[in-house]
Curated annotation (Swiss-Prot):
Subcellular location: Secreted
Similarity field: Belongs to the alpha/beta interferon family. IFN-alphaII subfamily.
CDD domains: IFab (cd00095)
Record function comment: Paracrine hormone primarily responsible for maternal recognition of pregnancy. Interacts with endometrial receptors, probably type I interferon receptors, and blocks estrogen receptor expression, preventing the estrogen-induced increase in oxytocin receptor expression in the endometrium. This results in the suppression of the pulsatile endometrial release of the luteolytic hormone prostaglandin F2-alpha, hindering the regression of the corpus luteum (luteolysis) and therefore a return to ovarian cyclicity.
Disulfide bridge positions per record: C1-C99, C29-C139
Top-level taxonomy: Eukaryota, Metazoa, Chordata, Craniata, Vertebrata
Miscellaneous notes: IFN-tau genes are intronless. They evolved from IFN-omega genes in the ruminantia suborder and have continued to duplicate independently in different lineages of the ruminantia. They code for proteins very similar in sequence but with different biological potency and pattern of expression.
PANTHER family: INTERFERON OMEGA-1, TYPE I INTERFERON
Key words, A-Z: Antiviral defense, Cytokine, Disulfide bond, Glycoprotein, Hormone, Pregnancy, Secreted
InterPro entries: 4_helix_cytokine-like_core, Interferon_alpha/beta/delta
GO molecular function terms listed in the Swiss-Prot or TrEMBL record: cytokine activity; hormone activity; type I interferon receptor binding
Pfam families from the UniProt entry: Interferon
Gene Ontology biological process: adaptive immune response; B cell activation involved in immune response; defense response to virus; female pregnancy; humoral immune response; natural killer cell activation involved in immune response; positive regulation of biosynthetic process; response to exogenous dsRNA
Name this protein carries in UniProt: Interferon tau-2
């Protein structure tokens, strides 16, 4: 399983698209900021094993895609940029699907992956609750856009770490 340079370029392009989606000055929205508990240490640190790292990366990208591929999201953002972001996230997910399939075949049990995956799901659940509580306001979406930039930046760090291991996820 190999993460190509195109995969890494796609990750950087997704971050650029999120930056371009900025519609508001963040200053009026600062009172709406919240700590969503990004599992940054888990994602950026060295504590994940190969199967966990691939699973966490896939889950983060899937949850980010799910967040932006909604009716509420399409009402909040420039449609062209949003479609490009969703397409980019989908491409990254497809790249990872083969890796995830290999990992799942190699392991009889997915119990080792469940803890980190549940942490990621809990993080995104908090984001969905926040958006609903804030009634999907423009400020709430701006806070989430900035948060997703942090999350995708962290996931890019994990992807770089996976590639540094010779580009071969099996060498982790």
């Amino acid at each position: 399983c190999y993460l190509s340079e195109d995969h890494m370029l796609g990750a950087r392009e997704n971050l650029r698209l999120l930056a371009r989606m900025n519609r508001l000055s963040p200053h009026p929205c600062l009172q709406d900021r919240k700590d969503f508990g990004l599992p940054q240490e888990m994602v950026e640190g060295n504590q994940l094993q190969k199967d966990q790292a691939i699973s966490v990366l896939h889950e983060m990208l899937q949850q980010c895609f799910n967040l932006f591929y909604t009716e509420h999201s399409s009402a909040a953002w420039n449609t062209t940029l949003l479609e490009q972001l969703c397409t980019g996230l989908q491409q990254q997910l497809e790249d990872l699907d083969a890796c995830l399939g290999q990992v799942m075949e190699e392991k009889d049990s997915d119990m080792g992956r469940m803890g980190p995956i549940l942490t990621v799901k809990k993080y995104f659940q908090g984001i969905h609750v926040y958006l609903k509580e804030k009634e999907y306001s423009d400020c709430a979406w701006e806070i989430i856009r900035m948060e997703m930039m942090r999350a995708l930046s962290s996931s890019t760090t994990l992807q770089k770490r996976l590639r540094k291991m010779g580009g071969d996820l099996n060498s982790l």
